[in-house]
């Protein structure tokens, strides 16, 4: 038997696909799926059932229909890509500048679900190639809802990882403004005012909008932000290359040259020059860029834009209490909840854990209050953007539950700048760049 005959043999094909299928079932951990071997056996060996019922059977010499061939190819592509999206990789586009210098607005990524293990779909009835919306309507049905379960991956979330996750506050959204934080609007405007803004949608965990941030604290860590810098368990965090902050830049009355600004990697259209300062009230800079700006001949002074008055931000900064004394730059210390750990519930720490108990762990708050303690059902993480003064992150909405973790950015396959025209809009230097 030649190699070509061996590869084309029906038993060879059956054994190959059967072994792959069994490996997938073992990974999935649900052995009821082994009954699928009957289907594979029939496809390649017995051929009793016409599984590709949509495909026309042609008589010898009959001309093949191009439409039928295209339909066959499309059905295969939909099944194959959906399988890849669920278990291996998923495309994701960076929507904001919160990770600027590390990940840019307009970066198109492949997110590896194998990094931490893929989640088994909790909302399986979903239109292929959509996440949560199509034409302004839900692209999924909640008729079938599964419990959270994660398959084994290559590892676990580590401190410093860039992580894609479901937005924790995205369980409730306004249909007309799905990108807005509904819970923040309720705190600031009041529930009655928000109710007047239109219909709300309740989304399952796996249908929340995706965010990407850097994991700065793991379950069991104690986090504190002092003068904008993160400290974990008393140790200052690693200074990542893309880390940047907002600075107040005072000049001698002359603007910084546009070419100099562009050379720094800053879009001049995003800078505001205040003649009364004179200078720039908010310039976003990395430590390297900061040194270059300070060295410019027309720059007199550069100072940090720290938020120091907690009274001004109590409705914006987690845990949204008047007496926390926290701002985006002076935050904590805060202990990150860990699965299986029991904490005593007090009047002081209840605002920290109330949403965990009711929304993420789906437990009974009154029962926990009566017991005076609570045991966490899953791990939690603290995420922050590298653009620390232009990032809505865990400082503004709290902890990220483990069941919200989607994966880790793996590859930038395309990057475009919306502020430029094609072909200059394509950032070629970021093409096929590993994250």
Regions found by a protein language model. Name each.
Residues 1-435:
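Extended hydrophobic leader/signal-anchor segments used for secretion and membrane insertion
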């Amino acid at each position: 038997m030649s190699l070509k005959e061996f590869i084309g043999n029906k038993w060879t094909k059956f054994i190959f696909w059967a072994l792959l299928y069994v490996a997938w079932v073992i990974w999935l951990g649900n052995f009821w799926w082994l009954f699928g071997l009957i289907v594979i056996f029939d496809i390649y060996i017995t051929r009793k059932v016409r599984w590709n019922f949509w495909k026309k059977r042609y008589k010898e010499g009959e001309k093949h229909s191009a439409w039928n061939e295209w339909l066959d190819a499309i059905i295969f592509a939909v099944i194959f890509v959906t399988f890849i999206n669920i278990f291996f990789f998923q495309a994701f586009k960076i929507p904001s500048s919160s990770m600027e210098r590390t990940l840019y607005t307009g970066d198109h990524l492949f997110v590896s679900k194998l990094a931490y293990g893929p989640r088994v779909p909790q909302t399986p009835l979903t239109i292929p190639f959509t996440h949560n919306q199509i034409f302004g309507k839900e692209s999924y049905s909640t008729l079938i809802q599964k419990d959270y379960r994660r398959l084994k991956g290559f590892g676990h979330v580590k401190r410093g990882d860039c992580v894609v996750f479901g937005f924790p506050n995205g369980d409730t959204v306004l249909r007309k403004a799905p990108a807005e934080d509904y819970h923040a609007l309720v705190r600031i405007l009041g529930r009655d005012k928000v109710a007047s803004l239109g219909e709300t949608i309740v989304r399952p965990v796996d249908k929340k909008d995706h965010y990407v941030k850097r994991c700065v604290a793991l379950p069991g860590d104690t986090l504190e932000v002092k003068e904008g810098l993160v400290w974990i368990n008393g140790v200052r965090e690693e200074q990542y290359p893309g880390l940047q902050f907002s600075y107040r830049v005072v000049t001698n009355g002359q603007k910084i040259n546009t070419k100099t600004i562009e050379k720094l990697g800053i879009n001049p259209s995003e800078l505001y020059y205040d003649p009364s300062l004179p200078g720039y009230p908010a310039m976003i800079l990395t430590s390297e860029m900061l040194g270059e700006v300070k060295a410019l001949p027309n720059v007199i002074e550069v100072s940090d834009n720290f938020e120091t008055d907690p009274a001004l931000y109590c409705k914006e900064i987690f845990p949204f209490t008047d007496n926390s004394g926290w701002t985006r730059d002076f935050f904590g210390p805060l202990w990150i909840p860990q699965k299986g750990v029991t904490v005593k519930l007090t009047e002081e720490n209840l605002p920290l854990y109330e949403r965990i108990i009711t929304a993420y762990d789906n437990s009974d708050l009154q029962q926990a209050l009566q017991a005076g303690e609570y045991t966490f059902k899953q791990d939690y993480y603290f995420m922050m953007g590298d653009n620390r003064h232009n990032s809505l992150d865990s400082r503004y909405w709290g902890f990220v539950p483990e069941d919200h973790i989607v994966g880790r950015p793996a590859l930038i396959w395309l990057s475009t700048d919306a502020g430029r025209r094609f072909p200059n809009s394509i950032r070629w230097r970021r093409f096929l760049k590993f994250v």
